[in-house]
Amino acid sequence: MCTKLFDPKLDYIFKKIFGSEKHPRILISFLNACIKPEHPITEVTIKNTEITKEYMEESFSRLDVLATTQDGEVINIEMQRADEKNMVKRSLYYWSKIFASEYKGKGRYSSLPRTICINVLDFKLLDEEKFHNVYILKNKENNNMLTDTL
């Protein structure tokens, strides 16, 4: 019997592992390990991964995995194998589109949920010793956090 393991860094395999509505426990475990939330994630709903184009000139974008937690937090997980030298801006673009899309239909800024982007990279992006890094918006003068919505 020949056992062949599939590379989980391949888009199709990654999406089958983490974006499956049939096996949410895998995604929940991954998110709890990455985010380390105060209250563990116990439930996720997989969402449509297509980013709606606002203008004709925009390119089509599809996220790898997009989910909502039981608390309404929206989480995007991207797997990137190749360094296309645009990951930071690409991640910010995806985050902004996801965040803005949550406003539509609700009409209240206060209803915007916490939105988290997790990038799983098969290359070194940052000059950091640790492979797991978390970034937030904060005041660069006094280090006070502006919000945990991002």
Identify the meaning behind each predicted range:
Residues 1-150:
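Elongated, amphipathic alpha-helical interaction scaffolds
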